[in-house]
Amino acid sequence: MSGFFQRLFGKDNKPAIARGPLGLHLNSGFTLDTLAFRLLEDELLIALPGEEFTVAAVSHIDLGGGSQIFRYYTSGDEFLQINTTGGEDIDDIDDIKLFVYEESYGISKESHWREAINAKAMGAITLNWQEKRWQRFFNSEEPGNIEPVYMLEKVENQNHAKWEVHNFSMGYQRQVTEDTYEYLLLNGEESFNDLGEPEWLFSRALGVDIPLTSLHIIG
């Protein structure tokens, strides 16, 4: 009988979709106007794989002080990152970037993991990579080599599996044109399997700024 009344009044027990900034959520999609990047493809290292993407996993990072990072991982090798301060409305958005993973590899020994994420390995003021010179923009005012920035990321995928990733990150940038920058994100990831054993991964991803006007949400 209760099912009858639920149908009659249009009510159901489906949980509300958890939406983030711009209404993005699991299984939603988004398109990008990539013309500006196509015109610079000879200057950029990043290769944008397409213009339409499906969100296969979402994550949230609380930076404290009202600052948050929302990440929308696609079914490919990309993720859309939205930084906000004070809330999740459009006026709270500070920054939107699209990152594409260039490489990633697993690390099996703890000693190698420690070496990969120490200040000397990933915290220099400048970095030479892919025959380009990159400038650190994480804590750019600090001199010398610095420790990576720790961020706890809470992830959920399309199967509603949830887990935490301990990120040790460093961001670099290089100026491509007067108003265009390309970003290099170095990231050491530590997570734990069902047995409580650590699993380590190191990755490099290239990114670009995404103007709000070039982003369209689907679903």
Language-model segments: which ranges?
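Mixed-charge, low-complexity intrinsically disordered regions
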Residues: M1-E51, V58-G219
